[in-house]
């Protein structure tokens, strides 16, 4: 475990040297982030976890000079024994050809039939490793090894909102229309980010996610419901 300054109002706790097991490191980061969030350390204003690290943001005017020592001592005492409650979220996804812009490419890369690709993608349980890139974008760990294909050589300038995509060992969902280089294999009618909501992002780090295949008709119906 190493600490690195992140400007003058944050620090990063890096766990990469603790284990070669990425799943264990992710569990460690999520556990420590959850513990720090609940610790109410004076001056700490936000905690953000990633695959192998945790960023702690603080108010320099309110926190004591020995912030690193306090956080180091807390993390050492909390360790991986501290667990975070995991929500389980189901994401409806339509794999219709109009939405699955890169399904043919994934089929060629994996030598799998379309139905097998969809079955593998929708039968796996994913963990939200972190939120980033754009507000509400979930980086999902747990993609089947059989579906691990490289990013597009030339990213799109516009990926439709709700696009369900995969790249290398990760899956993800684009909350907004935005540039992107992942392989789009479907689309969800859910809104992943609402700036007006009390909790703007639908998904949070540590959540468990499963995709449920839906028809085009159900997709359109859900979109209409969301627009009311």
How would you name each of these model-derived features?
Residues 1-228:
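Glycine-rich active-site loops that engage anionic ligands at enzyme catalytic sites
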């Amino acid at each position: 475990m190493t600490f690195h300054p992140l400007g003058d109002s944050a620090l990063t706790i890096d766990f990469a040297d603790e284990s070669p097991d990425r799943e264990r490191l992710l569990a460690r980061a999520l556990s420590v982030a959850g513990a720090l969030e609940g610790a109410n350390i004076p001056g700490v204003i936000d905690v953000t976890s990633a695959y192998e690290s945790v960023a702690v943001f603080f108010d320099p005017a309110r926190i004591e000079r020995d912030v690193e020592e306090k956080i180091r001592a807390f993390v050492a005492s909390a360790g991986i024994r501290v667990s975070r409650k995991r929500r389980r979220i189901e994401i409806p996804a339509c794999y219709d050809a109009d939405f699955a812009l890169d399904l043919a490419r994934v089929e060629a890369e994996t030598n799998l039939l379309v139905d097998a690709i969809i079955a593998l993608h929708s039968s796996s349980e994913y963990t939200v490793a972190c939120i980033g890139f754009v507000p509400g974008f979930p980086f999902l760990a747990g993609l089947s090894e059989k579906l691990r294909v490289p990013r597009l050589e030339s990213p799109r300038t516009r990926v439709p909102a709700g696009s369900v995509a995969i790249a290398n060992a990760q899956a993800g969902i684009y909350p907004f229309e935005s540039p992107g280089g992942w392989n789009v294999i479907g689309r969800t009618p859910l809104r992943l980010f609402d700036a007006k909501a009390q909790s703007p992002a639908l998904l949070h780090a540590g959540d468990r996610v499963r995709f449920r295949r839906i028809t085009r008709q159900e997709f359109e119906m859900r979109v209409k419901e969301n627009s009311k």
